[in-house]
């Protein structure tokens, strides 16, 4: 994890260097969540840097076509990371603002009628357009909207404490 995360918080998919499709906000969010679940303290400098970058790039439906920017993959892992990071300095406020933007982004874009009622169009989302389609976009959007019903941060943190010595 350390080798795959730059000092500015940007993360890469593998330690082979930055290549196309292997970096971006989605990877940053995955890095943040993974580091936290592996015991990194929520108030560490890296956690704070990554949280600040995510907070500055909230979910935005119109920007979903950006491969390395604000897409559904990023929104999902960003939602998990910021929810788990609520106990860090400023974390509750970051999560609250993110969650408001997430709902403002997702709910108006859910199909309200017809045979596709309840689903989410792939829209301009890069990964949905690259093959995931309606199933991908609907699954991720539903998982994001129910995130606080499925994950209890204290449970995740209690298991992460066992791994905290790895980061010392």
What are the language-model segments listed below?
Residues 2-104, 112-157, 164-168:
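An alpha-helical repeat/solenoid feature that recognizes helix-turn-helix modules
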């Amino acid at each position: 994890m350390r080798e795959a995360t730059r000092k500015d918080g940007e993360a890469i998919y593998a330690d082979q260097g930055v290549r196309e499709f292997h970096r971006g906000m989605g990877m940053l969010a995955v890095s943040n969540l993974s580091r936290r679940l592996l015991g990194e303290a929520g108030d560490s400098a890296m956690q704070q840097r990554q949280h600040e970058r995510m907070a500055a790039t909230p979910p935005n439906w119109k920007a979903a076509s950006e491969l390395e920017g604000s897409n559904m993959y990023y929104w999902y892992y960003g939602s998990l990371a910021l929810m788990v990071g609520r106990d860090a300095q400023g974390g509750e406020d970051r999560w609250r603002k993110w969650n408001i933007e997430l709902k403002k982004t997702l709910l108006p874009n859910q199909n309200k009628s017809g045979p596709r009622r309840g689903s989410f169009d792939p829209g301009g989302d890069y990964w949905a357009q690259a093959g995931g389609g309606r199933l991908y976009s609907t699954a991720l959007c539903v998982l994001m909207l129910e995130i606080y019903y499925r994950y209890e941060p204290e449970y995740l943190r209690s298991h992460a404490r066992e791994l905290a010595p790895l980061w010392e």
